């Protein structure tokens, strides 16, 4: 008897992903905004529709679109079949019953300043954070540092204050902050983690825009943490991005394309535009003009029209 050949399920090969989207320069048209809102899950659409400020709504929406783009294009799951959930700590994750060929698939997003960013790995625990260097809202930089004194170790403060000008000190402050947040987000502990348990030995001190650096080391509870690596980038003059990655225990997935350290250093951020975000999008809800009307009443639209009081 001749048995029919088994049909093989082709699992796509996946490498790590690093994406960024400039929320600050995105001034959405009515058609863009309504399409974007139709392309996310209803509960997320309702949540984003309640934001007071346009900048926050844009950043949150860009983050959701990046996640769905990632899952649709890298895992070959149709856009309208993707189901995202949140952990008890609020971290977005792919629903456990999704047809995911990578059981340890991990992604993380961050948005701050003018960008939303995403990092993803097929088999590696990952966390990402972005920080924009900006002057404190109130008080001087030394006063700001005094308030934040307990967030860093003595050695970290020595590194931060080793520069002559205060702006560069602030730059280094936010670089350290992004590193700590990337690790905390990677391990998924949320608020309450004592930041002084983490000490970063940053290297190099000066970073070029667009390059990726992996020399920085983590000291955790007084001991060097060798299971974690940190990728650092400057997307532009004012935005630092840190990505924390950890190889999981157990065997690697046979279809995962791993790279050695020399190649990992080339894992630069790809800057996406709006058309990139929705290239694979499938609208899931009817168009609702009220979401555009709400968006038009937020602060940023008033600023754009020059009518802010």
Curated annotation (Swiss-Prot):
Broad class of where this protein is predominantly found: cytoplasm
Cofactor list: Mg(2+)
GO cellular component: cytosol
Transferase listed as a keyword: yes
EC number(s) recorded for this UniProt protein: 2.7.8.7
Cofactor note: Binds 1 Mg(2+) ion.
Keywords assigned: Cytoplasm, Magnesium, Metal-binding, Transferase
GO biological process: 10-formyltetrahydrofolate catabolic process; protein maturation
Enzyme class: transferase
Protein's cellular compartments: Cytoplasm, Cytosol
Sites where the protein binds Mg(2+): 129, 181
Positions annotated to bind CoA: 47, 86-91, 108-111, 181-185
Superkingdom of this protein's organism: Eukaryota
Catalysis performed (reactions): apo-[ACP] + CoA = holo-[ACP] + adenosine 3',5'-bisphosphate + H(+); apo-[ACP] + acetyl-CoA = acetyl-[ACP] + adenosine 3',5'-bisphosphate + H(+)
GO MF terms held by the record: holo-[acyl-carrier-protein] synthase activity; magnesium ion binding
One Pfam family hit: ACPS
Subunit comment: Monomer.
Role of this protein: Catalyzes the post-translational modification of target proteins by phosphopantetheine. Can transfer the 4'-phosphopantetheine moiety from coenzyme A, regardless of whether the CoA is presented in the free thiol form or as an acetyl thioester, to a serine residue of a broad range of acceptors including the acyl carrier domain of FASN.
Family statement: Belongs to the P-Pant transferase superfamily. AcpS family.
Protein name (record): L-aminoadipate-semialdehyde dehydrogenase-phosphopantetheinyl transferase
UniProt source species: Mus musculus
Gene coding for it: Aasdhppt
């Amino acid at each position: 008897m001749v048995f029919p050949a088994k049909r093989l399920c082709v699992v796509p090969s996946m490498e790590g992903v690093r994406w960024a989207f400039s929320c600050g320069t995105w001034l959405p048209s009515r058609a863009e905004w309504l399409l974007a809102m139709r392309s996310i899950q209803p509960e997320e659409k309702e949540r984003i529709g309640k934001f007071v400020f346009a900048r926050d709504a844009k950043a949150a929406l860009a983050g959701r679109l990046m996640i769905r783009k990632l899952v649709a294009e890298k895992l070959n799951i149709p856009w309208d079949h993707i189901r995202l959930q949140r952990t008890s700590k609020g971290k977005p994750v792919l629903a456990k019953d999704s047809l995911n060929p990578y059981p340890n698939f991990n992604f993380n997003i961050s948005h701050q300043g003018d960008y939303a960013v995403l990092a993803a790995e097929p088999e590696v625990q990952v966390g990402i954070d972005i920080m924009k260097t900006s002057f404190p809202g109130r008080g001087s930089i030394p006063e700001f540092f005094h308030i934040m004194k307990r967030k860093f170790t003595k050695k970290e403060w020595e590194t931060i204050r080793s520069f002559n000008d205060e702006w560069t000190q602030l730059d280094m402050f936010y670089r350290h902050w992004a590193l700590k947040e990337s690790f905390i987000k990677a391990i998924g502990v949320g608020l309450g983690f004592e930041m002084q348990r983490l000490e970063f030995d940053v290297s190099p001190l000066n970073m070029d825009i667009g390059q990726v650096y992996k020399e920085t080391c983590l000291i955790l509870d007084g001991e060097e943490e060798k299971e974690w690596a940190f990728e650092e980038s400057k997307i532009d003059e004012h935005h630092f991005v840190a990505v924390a990655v950890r190889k999981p225990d157990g065997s690697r997935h046979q279809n995962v394309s791993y790279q050695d350290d020399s190649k990992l250093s080339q894992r630069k951020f790809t800057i996406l535009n709006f058309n990139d975000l929705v290239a694979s999008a499938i609208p899931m809800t009817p168009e609702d003009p009220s979401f555009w009307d709400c968006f038009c009443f937020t602060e940023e639209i008033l600023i754009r029209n020059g009518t802010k009081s």
